[in-house]
Amino acid sequence: WKEHAAIPGIARVQPISAPLEGGLLGVWGGFAPKTETKPAQLAMNGASYNAGCGTWTSLPVPADAVGEEVFTGGAAAIAVPQKGVVVVGGVNKDVFLAAINKLPEGYLLHEPEWYRFNNKVLCYRQGAWTQLLQHSSVARAGCALAYWDGWVYVVGGELKPGIRTSEIVRFRVD
């Protein structure tokens, strides 16, 4: 193992990452937990790492079709040939940030819709984000992704905190 330069900005617990064009590593999201002196913080932006020269470069914040910023904490990412990096699921930035700073009473008792997990599939390619689709079946946190023959498979994940599914769904990306 060899330690490389740290990602600039706040510490990032649970970021997502995937390889980018040009042999770079892309990293987005994550959060810095609260401490005795600071509230928790979300990392909305991304950064690409060039291992050849040991440098990080800022990447744009993921955004949906209407330009709203999307937090990628709890999401999953996969590199898809000729498409870019596909990002699925994740937690809602406002609900999550409030919970990690001060867990409200009854937090785990709500219906899945209350948590507003991300139901959009985003794609990062050549410096820009696009929204590929929106569907309730991808509103999951902590799912796994696989790509095969033009399809992205979304495997398992949480439908709400503490409630997991074994369901597998897929969508075309070509």
What does each of the following model-derived ranges do?
Residues 1-174:
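Kelch-like beta-propeller repeat domains
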